[in-house]
């Protein structure tokens, strides 16, 4: 099992190598795809072989670096017919067009847009390809390193906030949490956003267990006695990121979890052996008033949480916050192909043994299974927009933001 979504060999700035984990093959097959050009980056993002707003921004940026490196080394003959490498203005103009092309791969995720704006500025301010390549390398390294550092901060911020909130309410028992889609290591440079909070909650729980924390090396995040005991990830139809990816990460980290269907949340809340006290979700775009675009199904989960008095948190770095768009009405929601709903992609299984069927290369066999009439019309939005009224807190690397007395978020301090 691998939780390394992006492999970036960067010891030699003039000869970097990039590959991404093909997440469409998980959880049964681990395969990395090399990235050489912007077109490669576009392809893996568009096909959702890589997904998650932070990871999309990183892979998109890395694909630009790889194409720039190839031009610089003259190792990619096909660039010669597209770029005039003897004319920097021509090269810069065509690279700018390539950035627009890359952005069209997943328009809802603001992280990619923000990264491409910064790269466009670097492109504008550099005088030749060598300078651009050098400054882009530094930018991408910083982007990756800060993402991982910020994820750990967000995880601890969100976990501590929840534990202290429960303590103030007089709750000091074991509890469970909900999450949707995948927001962990596979969606970021590591650790995760919403799943990062769950990781921090689990580490806190282990610190309070003398059978686990035998040497006292694990330190609790808060003085609260409550402990997260279980996680309920939603399967997240139609792409099943919850069942394929989040469940995969929870099993890898040995965090107690039970996978549930998207339609069983209310019944699970009423029957859970541990009271469900919070839901943590990620975000592809948070606009100025706190309205949040995230994986389809997030809005209905927020409505359910509000009905049952369960705290609902959005977890995202400040790079996911769009400080220009005033509210959710201005968010463009990507619609996916009908076949992604009418077909289910998975691994062929030996039914009785529940083990993968293998091909002649001893690799699991993937297949697409039809589950709906081919003639049926399909509406398949990739995201929905949760109004800020349904969100209790926005967890960032700089702290947890809550609403004021008038029910409004103020995120201006992040900019």
Curated annotation (Swiss-Prot):
Gene Ontology terms describing biological process: L-methionine salvage from methylthioadenosine
Annotated GO MF terms: S-methyl-5-thioribose-1-phosphate isomerase activity
Keyword terms: Amino-acid biosynthesis, Cytoplasm, Isomerase, Methionine biosynthesis, Nucleus
Stored Pfam families: IF-2B (PF01008)
Catalytic residues as annotated in Swiss-Prot or TrEMBL: 284
Compartments it resides in: Cytoplasm; Nucleus
Catalysed reaction, written as an equation: 5-(methylsulfanyl)-alpha-D-ribose 1-phosphate = 5-(methylsulfanyl)-D-ribulose 1-phosphate
Pathway this chain belongs to: Amino-acid biosynthesis; L-methionine biosynthesis via salvage pathway; L-methionine from S-methyl-5-thio-alpha-D-ribose 1-phosphate: step 1/6
GO cellular component: cytoplasm; nucleus
EC number from the UniProt entry: 5.3.1.23
Major localization class: cytoplasm
Record InterPro entries: IF-2B-related, IF-M1Pi, IF_2B-like_C, Initiation_fac_2B_a/b/d, M1Pi_N, NagB/RpiA_transferase-like
Chain positions of site Transition state stabilizer: 181
Keyword Cytoplasm: yes
HAMAP family assigned to the protein according to its UniProt record, in alphabetical order: Salvage_MtnA (MF_01678)
Family to which the UniProt record says this protein belongs: Belongs to the eIF-2B alpha/beta/delta subunits family. MtnA subfamily.
Function: Catalyzes the interconversion of methylthioribose-1-phosphate (MTR-1-P) into methylthioribulose-1-phosphate (MTRu-1-P).
Protein name as catalogued: Methylthioribose-1-phosphate isomerase
Organism of this sequence: Vanderwaltozyma polyspora (strain ATCC 22028 / DSM 70294 / BCRC 21397 / CBS 2163 / NBRC 10782 / NRRL Y-8283 / UCD 57-17) (Kluyveromyces polysporus)
């Amino acid at each position: 099992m691998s939780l390394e979504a992006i492999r970036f060999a960067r010891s030699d700035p003039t000869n970097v190598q990039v590959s991404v984990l093909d997440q469409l093959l998980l959880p049964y097959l681990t395969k990395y795809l090399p990235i050489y050009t912007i077109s490669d980056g576009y392809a893996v993002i568009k096909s959702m072989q890589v997904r998650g707003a932070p990871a999309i921004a990183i892979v998109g940026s890395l694909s630009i670096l790889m194409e720039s490196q190839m031009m610089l080394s003259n190792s990619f003959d096909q660039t010669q017919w597209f770029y005039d490498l003897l004319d920097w203005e021509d090269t810069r103009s065509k690279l700018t067009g390539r950035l627009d092309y890359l952005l069209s791969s997943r328009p809802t995720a603001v992280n990619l847009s923000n990264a491409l704006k910064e790269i466009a500025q670097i492109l504008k301010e550099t005088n030749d390809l060598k300078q651009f390549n050098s400054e882009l390398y530094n930018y991408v390294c910083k982007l990756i390193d800060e993402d991982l550092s910020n994820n750990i901060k967000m995880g601890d911020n969100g976990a501590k906030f929840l534990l202290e909130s429960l303590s103030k309410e007089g709750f000091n028992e074991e509890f469970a949490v909900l999450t949707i889609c995948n927001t962990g290591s596979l969606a970021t440079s590591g650790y995760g956003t919403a799943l990062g909070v769950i990781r921090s909650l689990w580490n806190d729980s282990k610190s309070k267990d003398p059978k686990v924390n035998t040497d006292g090396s694990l330190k609790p995040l808060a003085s609260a006695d409550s402990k997260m005991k279980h996680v309920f990830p939603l399967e997240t139809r139609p792409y099943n990121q919850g069942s394929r990816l989040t469940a995969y990460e929870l099993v890898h980290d040995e965090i107690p979890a039970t996978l549930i269907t998207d339609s069983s949340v209310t019944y699970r809340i009423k029957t859970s052996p541990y009271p469900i006290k919070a839901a943590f979700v990620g975000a592809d775009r948070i606009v100025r008033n706190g309205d949040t675009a995230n994986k389809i199904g997030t809005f209905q989960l927020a409505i359910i949480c509000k009905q049952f008095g369960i705290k609902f948190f959005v977890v995202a770095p400040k790079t996911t916050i769009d400080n220009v768009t005033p509210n959710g009405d201005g968010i463009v929601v990507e619609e996916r192909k009908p076949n992604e709903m009418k077909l289910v992609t998975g691994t062929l299984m030996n039914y009785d043994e529940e083990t993968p069927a293998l091909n002649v290369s001893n690799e699991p066999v993937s297949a697409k299974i039809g589950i709906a009439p081919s003639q049926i019309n399909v509406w398949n939005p990739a995201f929905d927009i949760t109004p800020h009224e349904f969100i209790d807190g926005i967890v960032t690397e700089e702290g947890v933001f809550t609403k004021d007395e008038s029910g409004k978020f103020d995120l201006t301090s992040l900019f």
